[in-house]
Amino acid sequence: MSTNSDNDKIFQEVQKFVKNYDLNKDGSVTSFDIYRSFLKKMDGDIFKASQAAGVLCSTVDMDHDGKFTYQEIAKYCADEAKKNVEQNAEIAALADVEAMLLRFDKDKDKKLTKTEFVEYFKGNGHTPYSDRDQVLKIIDLDKDGCVSANELQEWFKKRRIDYARMVSARGPNC
């Protein structure tokens, strides 16, 4: 379910896209507008402008009618946001792991035992699954009964990427 914040961000990205490429300020964007915008940004280099416009147009204009609808631009913006999340998922997951270990790894061995892991769920006030053991089994890839920093990082990274895919697949909710 998208939030007003999600819709506001997508709307802002669409507005930014239109502002950047709608040179004649008629409120719509066509493939010619894209080309002219790139031509201006690339100091009149016809070849580079044509190439860049072709790539962007083939990416955004899904029905190939030469015009960009709100849905097409919003999907493009959502896909770009997803790419950014995927590119940053590794770094963000590492920060998540460090914060989690700092708070719950009582013996500072860079692993969470079942007892330490259960503390995480108690602190959150809920469990995404009915059985905490099931969650531990999902994250504990080497099945040693503990969750290592690497296993946590993979789990956090996967959750971030899955979320980005879900947001992108959902598209705008207007």
UniProtKB/Swiss-Prot annotation:
Binding site for Ca(2+) 1: D22, N24, D26, S28, D33
Domain of life assignment: Eukaryota
Binding positions (Ca(2+) 3): D140, D142, D144, C146, E151
Residue pairs linked by disulfide bridges in the UniProt entry: none
Pfam families xrefs: EF-hand_7 (PF13499)
UniProtKB keywords: Calcium, Metal-binding, Repeat
GO terms of molecular function: calcium ion binding
Transmembrane spans: none
Matching SUPFAM superfamilies: EF-hand
Annotated positions binding Ca(2+) 2: D105, D107, D109, K111, E116
Domain EF-hand residue range list: 9-44, 60-83, 92-127, 133-162
Protein name: Calcium-binding protein F
Organism this protein belongs to: Dictyostelium discoideum
